[in-house]
Amino acid sequence: MTVPLDRIRNFSIIAHIDHGKSTLADRLIQRTGGLTDREMSAQVLDNMDIEKERGITIKAQTVRLDYKAKDGQDYVLNLMDTPGHVDFAYEVSRSLAACEGALLVVDAAQGVEAQTLANVYQSIEHDHEIVPVINKIDLPAAEPDKVKAEIEDIIGLPADDAVLASAKSGIGIDEILEAIVARIPAPKGDPAAPLKAMLVDSWYDPYLGVVILIRVVEGTIRKGQQIKFMQADTVHLVDRVGCFRPKIEQLGEMGPGEIGFITAQIKEVSQTAVGDTITDARKPTAEPLPGFKEVQPVVFCGLFPVDAADFEKLRESLYKLRLNDASFSFEAESSAALGFGFRCGFLGLLHLEIIQERLTREYDLDLITTAPSVVYRLHLSHSKTEDAKVIELHNPADMPDPNRIDMIEEPWIEATIYVPDEYLGSLLKLCQDRRGIQKNLTYVGGRAQITYELPLNEVVFDFYDRLKSISRGYASFDYHQIGYREGDLVKMSIMVNGEPVDALSMIVHRAAAEARGRHMCERLKDLIPRHLFKIPVQAAIGGKVIARETIAAMRKDVTAKCYGGDATRKRKLLEKQKEGKKRMREYGNVNIPQEAFIAALRMGDEG
């Protein structure tokens, strides 16, 4: 039995990290009787440990709440818990497209932040009804009136009827539920039309196979039905239809406006693309839903096991993670310095950190991560054997012959940064140093909102950490890609004892190459232990060395056992030592410890 359309409310919660989104979701579940107090654990919807610890939501989750409103009617409220971080922007856009409205949760002490803004604008684009909720009003530092003014000034939403709440103390929860029923519109859709449903998310369950989260737009979906994924062009048989309350409950069928899950004996998440349209295989709908796009990795880096024997374990672990997260890619690669490993592609830096942390934590692996790099476009001129063409470069070590390169293009982003006035100067300097182009600067209350265009290459390294450190953690930052532009870029190689170390090679802007190279050489000089012979550490572009440091040799005092007597005896011993050192330098291997790699890749303030 499907639920009548006018009794359904689909909504998401938009909030910046730590503004209380998951806690509010917990309270709503508790208030509507989804779980008893005993079963309630903090952050019910955040399943991964990392999600709970970092206080972030990575995968979209959903829960169906039954609520008896004050008008005496029973309503079904579907809450979509969306990721709040910029790396998962596409997942957010699909989750928002599955709803008709949103709760905008803003911390009463901290006010509106950059990520909130990005998601609110997406929500407004979907024509959502937005209900502002000012959370944490019981904090001593809470300033609800100031935050209301911020919501009106920055976002342009009327905030006089914002709900004041404290999810932690349970204040204002009933008012929020009533506001959802009264202000968020009911979904539309024709139950008799051919099935059209949106694939919102999918994850792998060891018992059920791939579980697919869907929002039915038109028609009905039931057990035993043959369905077709329109983008993937595959046909499957539905063997389960259900919803989360948040415990799994099986349903016979789902109609328009309903959100729930299906399973269809699918083995790999990679077959289920987020945003795909699901329809009836026998009676398909004419048009797929708009807005689908392939998720492309943005940041690439190499992952190598510290112990070479862990290579197979790393491969298995990556396959297992891939079951749950089709948005990252990997392929095997080998490096002279680090042995065998994988070149992995991620949606952004947070995504990279999360995958890395899950590998260390859940699969107990010790890993070395090479410098993150972005995808460059190389325009190659024609040679005797090949025509002119454009190629994508993921790994600086694969750079072709510089003489063939006509032009290198790099990805650029538009960043929106909020920062308190007193840190504005150092923030502008940081953006300037990173080749940023200032587009806009406005003041809201005591904070500046700055819009900058920046090369993504300059941001992936340590921009976020520097931003947080110069603003004492008060700045918030959000970005989106704006396409490729030509750049004066060169490949910088690091050579130790005349041998290039491929794991440390990187693509840099020509103007910054010398400073970056000098910094890297100084760093390695301190990190590589002394050997019995002199070791030159050089940074080079092509054949030209742009920076050099020398690690002095350890010296054994060979003349210690000579007492007085003839000076030629001493000279003979010293000459012999000199010969030995020369031979050693030619054939000796320099042992670079793993810590040196990791520390060298973490550029400091001067980088």
Swiss-Prot record:
Gene Ontology molecular-function annotations: GTP binding; GTPase activity; guanosine tetraphosphate binding; ribosome binding; translation elongation factor activity
Reactions listed under catalytic activity: GTP + H2O = GDP + phosphate + H(+)
Location of this chain's protein in the cell: Cell inner membrane
Residues of the tr-type G domain: 6-188
Keywords associated with the record: Cell inner membrane, Cell membrane, GTP-binding, Hydrolase, Membrane, Nucleotide-binding, Protein biosynthesis
Residue spans crossing the bilayer: none
InterPro entries the record matches: EF-4 (IPR006297), EFG_III/V (IPR035647), EFG_V-like (IPR000640), EFTu-like_2 (IPR004161), G_TR_CS (IPR031157), LepA_C_sf (IPR038363), LepA_CTD (IPR013842), LepA_IV (IPR035654)
Binding residue positions for GTP: 18-23, 135-138
Membrane topology of the entry: Peripheral membrane protein
Main location per the UniProt record: membrane
Entry-linked PROSITE patterns: G_TR_1, G_TR_2
GO aspect biological process, one term: positive regulation of translation
EC number: 3.6.5.n1
Superkingdom to which the source organism belongs: Bacteria
Gene Ontology CC entries for this record: plasma membrane
PANTHER family in the record: TRANSLATION FACTOR GUF1 HOMOLOG, CHLOROPLASTIC, TRANSLATION FACTOR GUF1-RELATED
Summary of the function given for this chain in its UniProt record: Required for accurate and efficient protein synthesis under certain stress conditions. May act as a fidelity factor of the translation reaction, by catalyzing a one-codon backward translocation of tRNAs on improperly translocated ribosomes. Back-translocation proceeds from a post-translocation (POST) complex to a pre-translocation (PRE) complex, thus giving elongation factor G a second chance to translocate the tRNAs correctly. Binds to ribosomes in a GTP-dependent manner.
Name the UniProt record assigns to this protein: Elongation factor 4
The organism's taxonomic lineage, starting at the top: Bacteria, Pseudomonadati, Pseudomonadota, Alphaproteobacteria, Sphingomonadales
